[in-house]
Each structure stands twice: as structure tokens, then as C-alpha cells.
């Protein structure tokens, strides 16, 4: 599954990442997915989602919501760190999201992904750079 959408009224990049993950978890839950892998280029977000301590920072409410969604709705989940240079698909989806006119225009792809990202995935699998 891939998704792109415009988020508004954000305070920082970590909050944007957390909101995107929370929205993705809600979609995956509604689709009945029991096993997921989240990939992020934000090490702080990965740590926040997986550590036992409660986060009392500016993004605490969003972190708690994402954790709750993970713990209650998925039998198996992994949160993986992927360095930004290796995460070209996320970069393309972010560019697509920025081009959307409003937050009501979110796009979700279950299997037939847009060409702009499917070419990147194909080249990554082949070990090439597009």
C-alpha cells in the first residue's frame, strides 16, 4: 500500500511524519491488514514509536495515537529506519503530496502504484538508479 496526501497546520517535520504514519495505520486497519512494515527516514519517530517510555514532548498526543493503533490493531508490525538517500519512493510521494490542492485530495494505492514510484521500485530491485 502507498498513500499521498497533504497535511496542514503542522508544527515541525517530525509531526508531519507522525501524522502521515497515523493516517497510514488507520487506512491499514480499515483494510484489515494484520501485518505491516513501516519505513521511515526519521530515526526519532522510529524510537518514539518503539520505546517503552511515554513521550511528553510537543508530539506526545500523536505518538500515543500511533502507538495505540500499532499495539491494538496489528498482529505483527515492524518499524524500520531507512536513510533518506535510500528512500526515493517516499521523496516522490512527498512531492506528489505537496502538489495536491487540499487535504481532501488524498490518494491511496493498494497495488497498482503510480508510474513515478513504480519505476523507482523496479530500479531499486534491480540495483539501478533512475
Segments predicted by a language model, with ranges:
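Primary recognition of RNase H-like, Mg2+-dependent phosphodiesterase/nuclease domains
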Residues: 1-130
Amino acid at each position: 500500500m502507498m498513500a499521498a496526501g497533504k497535511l496542514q497546520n503542522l508544527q515541525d517535520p517530525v509531526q508531519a511524519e507522525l501524522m502521515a504514519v497515523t493516517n497510514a495505520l488507520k487506512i491499514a486497519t480499515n483494510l484489515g491488514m494484520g501485518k505491516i512494515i513501516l519505513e521511515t527516514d526519521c530515526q526519532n519517530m522510529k524510537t518514539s514509536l518503539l520505546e517503552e517510555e511515554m513521550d511528553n514532548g510537543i508530539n506526545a498526543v500523536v505518538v500515543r495515537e500511533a502507538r495505540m493503533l500499532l499495539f491494538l490493531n496489528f498482529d505483527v508490525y515492524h518499524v524500520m529506519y531507512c536513510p533518506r538517500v535510500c528512500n526515493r519512493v517516499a521523496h516522490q510521494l512527498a512531492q506528489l503530496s505537496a502538489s495536491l490542492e487540499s487535504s481532501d485530495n488524498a490518494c491511496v494505492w493498494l497495488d497498482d502504484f503510480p508510474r513515478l514510484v513504480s519505476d523507482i521500485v523496479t530500479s531499486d530491485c534491480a540495483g539501478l538508479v533512475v
